[in-house]
Amino acid sequence: MSKIQTLRGMNDISPQEAKEWSYLEQKLKTIAKSYGYDEIRFPLVEKTELYTRSNEAADIVTKEMYTFQDKGGESISLRPEGTAGCVRAAIDNDLLRTDKPRLWYLGPMFRYERPQKGRSRQFHQFSAEVFGLRSPEIDAELILMSSRFWKELGISNNIKLELNNLGDEKTRKSYSKALVEFLNNQNEDLDKDTQRKLIENPLRILDSKSSAILKLLENAPSIEDFIDEDSKEYQERLLEILDKSNLKFEVNPRLVRGLDYYNQTVFEWKTELLGSQDTILGGGRYDKLVEELGGKACPAIGFSIGLERLILLLKEQSLIKHEDKLDIYFICFTERSLEEAIMYSEKLKDELPYIVIKINLGLESANSQFKKADKSGAKMALILGEEELESKKISFKDLRTKSDQESLTFENLIKKLKT
């Protein structure tokens, strides 16, 4: 019988890799919490309407969503991104009526796209969202928090910040019209996908990955020439705060985000070490989305980090870490000693709840078990053989210092472990 393999673009995370993921996720969670952000969790599956209403023309909705009918005949989709679901959850749970929540979440997203390095059909994001605040100061807080991630992970020198301001609705309409007029004169040089975007959402053309289109856009009008005064002052204040924080950045007037709901501030952190999949974090303001999804008008801003890409970047610089926190490796030689090891292990956890213990259940040779104990990274080995069982003691060996074995009563072992 043939074996069943994982679906294309869906990847397993091995136990060793999971340690690296846990290390990274813990770093991100700790920093988000240090800024006063609270965790929120919401479903992987939502009504398709949630995404079509918020991103009608985005490629994610038109080309990449996993959409199907449930047994009740309702159209549902695996979440392709987290912001719409987070907004829906905030509205549903009445989080926005009296509070201005600052939230974080992480988990898998799903897009049916061509798998490649740094891009999978199931991928993972760590995200932060802020509701009820519209100010350069909160935009700066999110950007500075993301900068702190890189400092903590040791990658600040290989990642750069780009920002733009998309202005108000009038700005975007005026600029879109000018962009369409410019590109219509280049129509023979436009591929089918660009021609489609020219009709549906011209600003999305700025996010093209085609070198030919990017070359054309070098002579296109700039949104800076259409920006409204309020947005201009808003951006100046934001840049002033970032300057005072000694944060390096580049204003990129071609920067847009891949989703349709963004306005005003947008930003990305990019690296040159991962080829075409260069964006590690992307975010921006979405001040109309809450209202579009059925809530009362509420400004908002957020960002998402692609965890697969971030792990690739850390590995590229040999910075990925994990903590093999194994304290005790139990070595046993008989079924009776296995039974005693299990009992001792439970007693140890009663006294030291956070101690990490692994029992070798294979009844292998002493040489084999000691090799596995060394390889496990454990700090110490506890040995139970017939001699130990008869004397009601446990043999203790420090695997770090390689000192001689000691024979200890359980009470003395506890004292030693607590010192």
Question: Where in this protein do the model-derived segments appear?
Answer:
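TRNA-recognition modules of translation machinery and tRNA-sensing kinases, especially anticodon-binding
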Residues: 1-419
